[in-house]
Amino acid sequence: MSGSSSSLKLRVQRIEWIAEDVLEIEFRGETDLPAFTSGSHIDVHLPNGISRSYSLVNDPADRSRYCIGVGMDPKSRGGSRHIHTQLRPGQIIEVDPPLNNFVLDESAERTVLIAGGIGITPIFSHARRLAQLQKEFEVYQAARERSRAAYCEKLEEISPMYHLHIDDENEGQFLDIPRIVQQQTPKTHLYCCGPPAMMQSFEAAVAKIPESQVHVEYFVARSEAEQGQSGDFFLGLARSGREFLVPADRSALEVLLENGVTVSNSCQEGICGSCETRVLEGTLSLIHISEPTRPY
């Protein structure tokens, strides 16, 4: 899948292992790259035709490069697997300019950052920014094994209140998110990024906290949660007058692309926001994840 007209052609400058099954990829261009803020992501258009969104982990002040952290997903459909097995330094890759759906509220009196697995990438970015601003913040990072905890050494350096939870060193016990949330002051802002079970635990724990103080970023599709929870529906296009039946087990994007409708998209999983469009009529339902899997 090629990028949009605003896509950048960047060179793969460096590929480096930073943890078990986690690579950091550095892209560089011929000139300064478009600016971004902590929590931003870029859509990477891979040579195999797949596009995926990855959080930027380098300092926004350094506009000479973009760096992303990519975990190897055993269920990969070609994104992380291609990067881990096929990407090489020197390749030219199309990348869309940064977008930010996980904005940091820099005015917060206190901030708590929680991450699981590769969800540490945008959290690491926020932690660096808060340290630069000399704000009060805590970081909780969870991983199954110490060898899989990406950026842990850097987080120890920038945050005096950094907590690393390793399941295998705690008799298999997961990070106690409800306890962390209960300990916070009323005006604390809370951020979380991680796999479905962690996100489910977090959203349950913050249910009574004002929405303006709760910030989440999903790295996985919600398709499993959606299946069986909503029925078929008709989708109408205002300009063309065309109408399509969207089955319960398909996404609107899939049906539109299948019928030759041009739609800006990237991850094709409802995560990155590239296909977001305006709804003129109808009611949308927010489907919450309920997936009792290991959280990282």
Regions found by a protein language model. Name each.
Residues G3, R81-R239, L245:
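FNR/FR-type flavoprotein reductase catalytic core
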Residues T37-G39, Q227-F233, I271:
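A short, compositionally biased
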Residues I42, F233-A238, C275-T277:
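Short polybasic amphipathic segments
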Residues G231-S264:
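C-terminal accessory/binding modules appended to enzymatic or scaffolding proteins
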Residues P122, V261-T283, R294:
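Local cysteine-cluster metal-coordination motifs and their immediate loop/turn environment
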Residues S2-I92, D96, E106-E109, A143-E145:
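Ferredoxin-reductase
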Residues I287-Y296:
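Single conserved hydrophobic/aromatic residue that forms the stacking wall/gate
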